Amino acid sequence: MAAPGSGAPCAELCRQLLLTLVVFSFACEACKKEIFNIPSKLEADKMIGRVNLKECLGSVDRIQSSDPDFRVLEDGSVYTAHAVVLSDEKRSFTIWLSDTEKRTQKEILVLLEYQKKVLKKRHTKETVLRRSKRRWAPIPCSMQENSLGPFPLFLQQVQSDAAQNYTIFYSISGRGVDKEPLNLFFIERDTGNLYCTQPVDREEYDVFDLIAYASTADGYSADFPLPLPIRVEDENDNHPIFTEAVYNFEVPESSRVGTTVGVVCATDRDEPDTMHTRLKYSILEQTPRSPGLFSVHPSTGVITTVSHYLDREVADKYSLIMKVQDMDGQFFGLMSTATCIITVKDSNDNLPTFRQNAYEASVEENTVNVEILRIPVEDKDLINTANWRANFTILKGNENGHFKITTDKATNEGVLSVVKPLDYEESHQVVLEIGVANEAPFTRDVALRMTTMNRAVVTVHVKDQDEGPECSPEVQYIRIKENSAVGSKISGYKAYDPETKSSSGLRYKILHDPKEWITVNEGSGSLETYKTLDREVITPKNDLYNITVLAIDQDGRSCTGTLAVSIEDVNDNPPEILQDYLVICKGNMDYVDISAIDHDSSINGAPFYFSLANTSPEINRLWTITRVNDTAARLAYQKNAQFQEYFIPVAVKDRAGLSATKTLRVNLCDCTNPVQCRAARRSADVILGKWAILAILLGIALLFSILLTLVCGIVSARNKKAFPDDLAQQNLIISNTEAPGDDKVCSANGFMTQTVNNANQGFCGTMGSGVKNGGQESIEMVKGGQQTLESCRGAGHHHTLDSCRGGTIEVENSRYTYSEWQNFTQPRLGEKLHLCNQDEEHMPSQDYVLTYNYEGRGSPAGSVGCCSEKQEEDGLDFLNNLEAKFAALAKTCTKR
C-alpha cells in the first residue's frame, strides 16, 4: 500500500515539471521595440512603417497583430486595416512571430506616437549631462515617404559632446538643404533638432546625405563634421505598369498542353525586393468565352496553353485581359491591366476530301495532252496556304504512264490529263485510284488519329478511232559489217496496222540518213546498202548509226520509227604514230617517247607493238625502241650516236596484226644553240592548211590580173601617134639638165638614123635643131636605152639628142611609115639648125667671167652651150607695152 501511495505524488510532480517545460518553450521573448511617428488620422491600407522581422526571428511562418486595426505583411510592412484615428498621443500594439517547426515565438512591441511640434529648449550648462567618453557619431535616421505630417516634421536631435563645455551652434548642408531640393530640411541652431518641411517622394530621392556641423559662438569647429544620412522609407504609391498596352502573340492550332504562347512583363517604381514590388499576374477575362485555354504563371508572366483543343476553324483569335498586382497579389495591392491578342495560326489539321467517291471520264485513243476530268476537293484550312493547297497523286492504274494529274492553283481542283496515247485495242477502259493530300505535312496528333490521304476512283473509257500504221517498237535494231559490199541486203523496219495487225499495204520511205548509205524498198521496207559503210567516218552514238523511217498506209496516215544500225568494226585502219619530228638534247635526254592511235574499235586497237623497220645496221646499232604502255614506246639512242638528224622508220602493229610504218625525223642535238633545233623543227612542222593554200591561189590570181592590166595599157599606148606635133601640148618638159652646156657648133647635116639589133651595141644619132618661138620639142627614139639631149641655141629653145648606151634600139610601129616620118622631120630640123648657126654668128663675144652659185656638187650634165649666151634683152620688147594691171610688177622688177 505504501508503494502506490508514494508513487502518486511522484507522477504528479513529473506532470507539473513537463507542463512547466512546455510553457517555457512557448514563452514569448520580446524583441526590439519599434516606434513610429504618425499623424492623428490614418486612411485605410496606409503604410505606417516597417519592422525587421528577420532580426527578431530568423524563420517566420506565422505573423499576428494584437490590434485588428493594423496588419503586418511578410516583409514587415505595417498597414492600417481601415481608417484609424488616434485619440491619445500614444498607441501601441504587439506583433507575434511564430516558428512552429522550432516551437519558438517572439513578439515585437510597436509604439505609435502622435506629437505636435515641440521646441525643446537648450539645457543650461549646469543641466547637461557630462559624458566624457561619448563621441560625435552618425545617428541612423529615416522618414516615411509621402508623410502626412504635421510639418515641419521632427526627425531627430543632433548633439555634440562638445556641448558639455561650450555653447554649441548646429548647422547642416547637403542635398535637401543648400542643394536641390532646397530647404527640405532644417536644423534648430541651438537645440540640434532636425526637421523636414514637406512630403518626400522616394522614387525621386531615396536617401539624403546631409552633413551636420557643430561650432562655437566665435565660429570655431568644436567637432568634426558629422555625416547624417536620412533614408526615405518606401510607400506603395506606384501602380505596376505593363511594358506594352497591347501584346500580340501567335500560337499554332492543336498545340500541346503547356505550349508557350508569350510573356507579359510589368514594372513597379517602388522599392525593389519589397512587397511593394512583388508582382503577381493573372487573367481577368478571355474572349470569346470558351473553356479556359490559357493560363499565366503568377510570377514570371509566361502565358501557356492548358488545352489541346485550340482550333482555328472555331476561333482564329483570342483576347485576354491581363492583370498585374503588387503586394504579392493581396487584395489591397495596387493593380493595372493590359490586353493580350492571341492569334491562332493555321496548321494542317484538316484533310482535303473528295466531294464524291467515284468519277468517270472518256477519251479517244491516240489522243495526247488533253484534259479529261476536273476533280474538286474541300479543305477547312486557311485558303491559299500550303495547308489548304491540294496535292493529287495517281496511286494505281497508271503503270504505263498514260495519265498525269496536276493541281489548278486558282480553284484547288485536280486536273486529269492524258500525256501518252491510249490504245483501244489494248484496253477499252482504265481504272485509276486518285489520292489527295496537302502540300504541308499533317500535324502529329492528326496523323496519329486519322489517315493522311483521301482516295477516289476514276474510270476512264477509251473510245475507238480509225488509226494509221503503228511503228512499234519505235526503235528497231539491226547489225551489219563495216565495208560491206554495195547492194548488200539488210532486214528493214517493220510497221503494222493496229486494226489488222498486218504490214501489208504499207509503204516505206527514209526520212533521214546522215551519210545516205542506205536505200529502202518502198513496198517491203527492206534495206540495201547504197555506199560502203565506214564506221570511222562518223561518230555513232552508242556505236549505232540511226536511220529515220516513215511508214505510210493507203490513206496517207503515217508513223515514224528509228532503225538503229550497229556497224560491226573491221580492222581497216592501222595504228598511226602521232609524232613526225623529234628533238633529243644529248646529255639531258636519253630517250624520247612516241605514241600511236587507232581509229578502229578497241578490239582492233591497242595494245600496239612498236619496232624498228630499218635493215640499216647503223640505225639498229645506234637506236633501240622499248614498250612504255599499250599505246606508247620509248626511242633511245646509244652513247656513241653523233649529233645529226636521223630518219628512223618505226613500224607499229595493233592487236589484230594490222601494221604501218612511219619514218620519224629525229634531230639529235647538243642543244647549245636551242634556236637552231627549234628552227629546224618549225620548218619540219610547217604544213599548209586549206586557208593558206587558198590565200596563195588568190595572190597568184591577183598577180595575173595586174600583169594583164599592164599589158593592156602598153598595147593601148602603142596605138597612139608615134610623132606628135612639134608643140609642147601645154605641158612642161623635163630636160634633167641643170649645168651649163658645152660650147658646140651644131652641124647642119641631115638627119641620120640607124637600127642596131645587137643588144651589146649602142646607138648614136645626131639631130639638128631649129628655132621655134615659144615651144620646145623632144623626140624619143629608143626604148630600153639612155638618151641625152645636147644643147643648141636657138631663140631660147634647146634640143639635144645624145647617144644611147647598152640596149636594143627599137623603132615604134605606128601609123606613120619611115618615109613619112623623114619627110615630116627633116625639113623642120634643117631649118632649126640653120637658124641656130645664124644666131651663133651674130652673138657678141662675152669674155668676162660668169658667176654661178655653188649647189654642193658638180653637175653630171654638159654645158647648156649657146642657150646660156642668150642676151637678156632678146625677146623682151613686149615689156615696153604692159597693161595697167602689170604696172606694179614691172616697177618691182626694174633695176635701179
From Swiss-Prot:
Annotated signal sequence range: 1-26
CDD domains for this protein: Cadherin_repeat
Proregion positions: 27-134
GO biological process, one term: cell-cell adhesion
Cytoplasmic side: 712-896
Gene3D superfamilies (alphabetical): Cadherins (2.60.40.60), TCF3-CBD (Catenin binding domain) (4.10.900.10)
Keyword Transmembrane recorded: yes
Membrane topology: Single-pass type I membrane protein
Keywords assigned by UniProt, alphabetized: Calcium, Cell adhesion, Cell junction, Cell membrane, Cleavage on pair of basic residues, Cytoplasm, Glycoprotein, Membrane, Metal-binding, Repeat, Signal, Transmembrane, Transmembrane helix
Organ and tissue specificity: Expressed in stratified epithelia only, such as the epidermis, tongue, esophagus and rumen (at protein level).
Residue stretches spanning the membrane: 691-711
Gene Ontology CC annotations of this record: desmosome; plasma membrane
Record localization: Cell membrane; Cell junction, Desmosome; Cytoplasm
A molecular function (GO) term: calcium ion binding
Glycosylation: residue positions: 165, 391, 546, 629
Extracellular side: 135-690
Superkingdom per UniProt: Eukaryota
Keyword presence, Transmembrane: yes
Domain notes: Calcium may be bound by the cadherin-like repeats. Three calcium ions are usually bound at the interface of each cadherin domain and rigidify the connections, imparting a strong curvature to the full-length ectodomain.
Function: A component of desmosome cell-cell junctions which are required for positive regulation of cellular adhesion. Required for cell-cell adhesion in the epidermis, as a result required for the maintenance of the dermal cohesion and the dermal barrier function. Required for cell-cell adhesion of epithelial cell layers surrounding the telogen hair club, as a result plays an important role in telogen hair shaft anchorage. Essential for successful completion of embryo compaction and embryo development.
Record-given protein name: Desmocollin-3
Annotated source species: Bos taurus (Bovine)
Name of the gene encoding the protein in the UniProt record: DSC3
